Structures are given as structure tokens and as C-alpha cells.
Amino acid sequence: MSLKEFADALPDYAKDIRLNVGSLLGDQTLTEQRKYGLLLACAHGSGYKPIVEATEAEVAGKLSPEAANAARAAAAVMAMNNVYYRFVHLASNKEYGQMPAKLRMNVIGSPGIEKDDFELFSLAVSAMNGCGLCIDSHEKVLRQHGVAADVIQTAARVGAVIKAAATVHATAV
């Protein structure tokens, strides 16, 4: 099942989500690696296997093995980092922010693809997971690399739409 077929199976009350998935698939503003990498990272970031499977089918042959692995790695490391750094950010005791994280995250330094694309995937998953500290960190790096605000906004939209599609599909009555 493709991502389009997945979206087409959403109930009528989620018509807007279905249309938004179609808009993302038809997006011409992002590079292919960014578009399909974002979709894959966000699908994995949702933690919902049916949308992961549909997105894996959608991106097959459209992403290099390195880019697909980087998208999956972004989702994996953000699953860890977003929880930890959201804790650091929200805890009243600021001492935690001064302590070393002691978490392995080597993939951030060596993702196997362009740094800005990996940061974009990480930002989208961080938006899905609600980690403000991570969003700010990734957005800052992206802007330093010259990534335009509309590209960053698109990444956040991908996260929002994929999260909504996964949630609706998982809870449809």
C-alpha cells in the first residue's frame, strides 16, 4: 500500500488530512531527498507501523539507501533526544541542563547524507514530539546553513500531516 492509498483509506471526517497528504506528495518546492526523507522520518517518528509500511513503499526507489537510513536514524535518535531534552527544558531545576546527557547520538555528526537534510528530518520529528529545545536547536543550524524559512515550515507541515494521518488511522471508528 502506498502513502496515497493509506490516506485514501482515511474516513470522511479526516478529508482535510487526506487532501494534505496528497498535497505533500505533490510538493514541488523540496528536493526529492528532502520530500521523501521527511515523509519517511515522520512516518517512523509516528511509531505507527501501518503508516511506516505505507511510507516505506512510497519512498522505495525514490531515496538512496543512505538517505532512507538517515531518515530512519533521525526518527530513532529523536525518539530518545526529544524525551530527554524536553525533560531538561521543562524541569524547574536547571541543574539538569548543565549535566552531560550521556546519550550516544553519533549519527547526528555523521548521518551519511547532507547535514542540512538530516537536520531538517530531525526538526520535523522534533516538532511531532513537541520538544521546543530540539526545534530551536535544529532550526538554528538549518538557518546557519542557509535553509529558507519556507522549507523549515514545510518540514513542520510534513510532521503535522503525517502525525494526524497516523492518529486518525489508528483511532478511526
From Swiss-Prot:
Its EC number is 1.11.1.28. SUPFAM superfamilies: AhpD-like. The active site is at 131 (proton donor), 134 (cysteine sulfenic acid (-soh) intermediate). The keyword DNA repair does not apply. GO terms for biological process: cell redox homeostasis; response to oxidative stress. Disulfide bonds join 131-134. Antioxidant protein with alkyl hydroperoxidase activity. Required for the reduction of the AhpC active site cysteine residues and for the regeneration of the AhpC enzyme activity. This is Alkyl hydroperoxide reductase AhpD. It comes from Rhizorhabdus wittichii (strain DSM 6014 / CCUG 31198 / JCM 15750 / NBRC 105917 / EY 4224 / RW1).
